[in-house]
Amino acid sequence: MKLIFAGGGTGGHVFPAIAIAQEILRTQQNAEIQFVGTERGIEATAVPKQGFPMHLIPVAGVKRGFSPKELFENLKVPMRLQRSLSACHDILQREKPNVVIGTGGFVSGPIVWEAQSKKIPTLIQEQNSMPGVTTRLLSLRASEVHLSFEESKTYIRRTNGVFVTGNPTRQFQSHRPAQAKAFFSLDSTRKTLLVFGGSLGARSINQAIESNLEEWLEKFNLIWQTGKLDFADIATRIGSRKNLWYNAFIDQMDMAYAAADLAVCRAGASTLAEITHLGKPSVLVPYPYAAANHQFYNAKSLADNHAALLIENKDIGLETSKTEIMSLLQNESRLKQMSENSLKLGKPHATRIIAEHVIRLAELG
């Protein structure tokens, strides 16, 4: 069995692909798995680290700005697309995969499109509530389309072969809250707020936390991933504090989730898959510049199901937002209800189910 995965640009597209690939290898040790990506996306480093071979293509997405540099880069897009289609044609001719799997991002477009043109089975996995342009186009000819949200069906112009499977996510070890709080040297009797905004961080969230730090620490424990861009400056200003653990990155995310009574974070698809898998109540602050504002719609899906509180990026620094979060963190019954609602939305078996569908497509040919 030979499979080709394509998805990249951001971790939200790459890591689901890696999770599916690893699950397939767990049951199909002889499967040959390759990836297609770009040298500028996170996949260029993340995929080889997992031991998978990588084909690089020159495709690039359309820039949404209007600066001279961005306009110039957009002029190159058609040429890069044509070169990428040609490269993907050659890859498919040479490798002859049984199935091609696309997990989103512009990089998945050329290889999945070429595979469909050659009648090679294709499977699309979409992470976001509002599917991107690439997914909508490729879904028309895909063998199967796997979605993470029920409401995503309204954007897919077909009903057969469409499944709401959930978003593949990494697996976490289970820990008792007291054990996890002790890991971060925090008071086991206090409510704990977990704040994170990705590897780079989220400046608006960081500023909202730091501006009221004394008040947060007076009442709660705080586990705070600042991201690497703001960490040095924040560390210089605040030093070490009681009831506070902070760093640029959280390596032991399983411990952080276990310690947390409430999470404040962005609304990327992978993050939401993790918090619903674990049944964590959350305050979601969508990144306002995400493509097609997809983080807002991701967050709205949880908020509409009373599993999360949605606060827009422009409002996270307001006094009313701080008061609302603090009130929520002290409301045990509401946290419990949100946790139950979050867990209902979780799809912990997504990785296994999608892997099984890929294997079946490969066997059917």
Curated annotation (Swiss-Prot):
UniProt-listed InterPro entries: GlcNAc_MurG (IPR006009), Glyco_trans_28_C (IPR007235), GlycoTrans_28_N (IPR004276)
The keyword Nucleotide-binding is annotated on this UniProt entry: no
Pathway, per record: Cell wall biogenesis; peptidoglycan biosynthesis
Gene name linked to the record: murG
Localisation: Cell inner membrane
Binding site for UDP-N-acetyl-alpha-D-glucosamine: T10, G11, G12, N128, R170, S199, I250, Q295
Membrane disposition: Peripheral membrane protein
Catalyzed reactions per annotation: di-trans,octa-cis-undecaprenyl diphospho-N-acetyl-alpha-D-muramoyl-L-alanyl-D-glutamyl-meso-2,6-diaminopimeloyl-D-alanyl-D-alanine + UDP-N-acetyl-alpha-D-glucosamine = di-trans,octa-cis-undecaprenyl diphospho-[N-acetyl-alpha-D-glucosaminyl-(1->4)]-N-acetyl-alpha-D-muramoyl-L-alanyl-D-glutamyl-meso-2,6-diaminopimeloyl-D-alanyl-D-alanine + UDP + H(+)
Enzyme Commission number: 2.4.1.227
Protein name: UDP-N-acetylglucosamine--N-acetylmuramyl-(pentapeptide) pyrophosphoryl-undecaprenol N-acetylglucosamine transferase
NCBIfam families: murG
Keyword annotations: Cell cycle, Cell division, Cell inner membrane, Cell membrane, Cell shape, Cell wall biogenesis/degradation, Glycosyltransferase, Membrane, Peptidoglycan synthesis, Transferase
Assigned GO CC terms: plasma membrane
PANTHER family according to UniProt: GLYCOSYLTRANSFERASE, UDP-N-ACETYLGLUCOSAMINE--N-ACETYLMURAMYL-(PENTAPEPTIDE) PYROPHOSPHORYL-UNDECAPRENOL N-ACETYLGLUCOSAMINE TRANSFERASE 1
UniProt keyword annotation of S-adenosyl-L-methionine present: no
Biological process according to GO: carbohydrate metabolic process; cell division; cell wall organization; lipid glycosylation; peptidoglycan biosynthetic process; regulation of cell shape
Family (UniProt): Belongs to the glycosyltransferase 28 family. MurG subfamily.
CDD domains: GT28_MurG
